[in-house]
Amino acid sequence: MEEKQIMAFRDEEGNKVEFEVVAKIYLGEKNKKEYIVLSPVEGNGDEADDFVFRVDKVNDSVEYNLVEDDEEFRLVKKEYKKLLY
Protein backbone atom coordinates (compact mmCIF):
# COMPACT_ATOMS: atom_id res chain seq x y z
CA MET A 1 0.00 0.00 0.00
CA GLU A 2 1.33 3.40 -0.99
CA GLU A 3 1.97 5.85 1.84
CA LYS A 4 -0.06 9.07 1.73
CA GLN A 5 1.90 12.23 1.02
CA ILE A 6 0.70 15.05 3.29
CA MET A 7 1.55 18.73 2.85
CA ALA A 8 0.71 21.53 5.29
CA PHE A 9 -0.05 25.15 4.48
CA ARG A 10 -1.24 28.15 6.48
CA ASP A 11 -4.63 29.67 5.71
CA GLU A 12 -5.51 33.38 5.81
CA GLU A 13 -5.90 33.27 9.61
CA GLY A 14 -2.56 31.51 10.10
CA ASN A 15 -4.10 28.12 10.89
CA LYS A 16 -2.27 25.01 9.72
CA VAL A 17 -4.28 23.09 7.12
CA GLU A 18 -3.18 19.66 5.91
CA PHE A 19 -3.69 18.36 2.38
CA GLU A 20 -3.12 14.98 0.81
CA VAL A 21 -1.44 14.81 -2.58
CA VAL A 22 -4.00 12.80 -4.55
CA ALA A 23 -2.35 13.06 -7.98
CA LYS A 24 0.68 14.29 -9.88
CA ILE A 25 -0.07 15.48 -13.40
CA TYR A 26 2.41 16.29 -16.17
CA LEU A 27 1.31 18.50 -19.09
CA GLY A 28 3.13 19.56 -22.22
CA GLU A 29 5.11 17.65 -24.80
CA LYS A 30 8.51 19.37 -24.77
CA ASN A 31 8.77 21.23 -21.48
CA LYS A 32 6.55 19.13 -19.25
CA LYS A 33 5.03 21.11 -16.40
CA GLU A 34 4.35 19.29 -13.17
CA TYR A 35 1.14 19.81 -11.20
CA ILE A 36 -0.19 18.33 -7.99
CA VAL A 37 -3.81 17.93 -7.00
CA LEU A 38 -4.36 18.41 -3.26
CA SER A 39 -7.37 17.38 -1.22
CA PRO A 40 -7.99 18.61 2.34
CA VAL A 41 -7.26 15.86 4.89
CA GLU A 42 -10.22 17.08 6.97
CA GLY A 43 -12.48 17.43 3.93
CA ASN A 44 -15.46 15.36 2.93
CA GLY A 45 -13.75 13.79 -0.08
CA ASP A 46 -15.63 15.98 -2.55
CA GLU A 47 -13.60 16.62 -5.69
CA ALA A 48 -14.84 20.24 -5.65
CA ASP A 49 -12.68 20.78 -2.55
CA ASP A 50 -9.48 19.89 -4.47
CA PHE A 51 -6.78 22.45 -5.21
CA VAL A 52 -4.39 22.42 -8.17
CA PHE A 53 -0.84 23.65 -7.72
CA ARG A 54 1.86 24.06 -10.36
CA VAL A 55 5.28 22.84 -9.24
CA ASP A 56 7.85 25.44 -10.30
CA LYS A 57 11.58 24.90 -9.92
CA VAL A 58 13.26 28.21 -9.10
CA ASN A 59 17.05 28.07 -8.79
CA ASP A 60 17.61 25.10 -6.47
CA SER A 61 14.26 25.17 -4.73
CA VAL A 62 10.70 24.08 -5.47
CA GLU A 63 7.72 26.44 -5.32
CA TYR A 64 4.07 25.40 -5.21
CA ASN A 65 1.88 27.97 -6.95
CA LEU A 66 -1.89 27.80 -6.91
CA VAL A 67 -3.25 27.54 -10.45
CA GLU A 68 -5.60 30.48 -10.92
CA ASP A 69 -5.76 30.54 -14.72
CA ASP A 70 -9.08 28.95 -15.77
CA GLU A 71 -7.72 27.26 -18.90
CA GLU A 72 -4.67 25.82 -17.13
CA PHE A 73 -6.89 24.60 -14.27
CA ARG A 74 -9.33 22.99 -16.73
CA LEU A 75 -6.53 21.11 -18.52
CA VAL A 76 -5.11 19.73 -15.28
CA LYS A 77 -8.55 18.66 -14.00
CA LYS A 78 -9.26 16.98 -17.36
CA GLU A 79 -6.07 14.89 -17.02
CA TYR A 80 -6.90 14.14 -13.39
CA LYS A 81 -10.33 12.81 -14.38
CA LYS A 82 -8.64 10.50 -16.90
CA LEU A 83 -6.68 8.98 -14.01
CA LEU A 84 -9.88 8.41 -12.04
CA TYR A 85 -11.96 6.76 -14.75
From Swiss-Prot:
Signal peptide annotation: none
Domain of life: Bacteria
Family of the protein in this entry: Belongs to the UPF0473 family.
Record's protein name: UPF0473 protein CPE1618
Organism this protein belongs to: Clostridium perfringens (strain 13 / Type A)
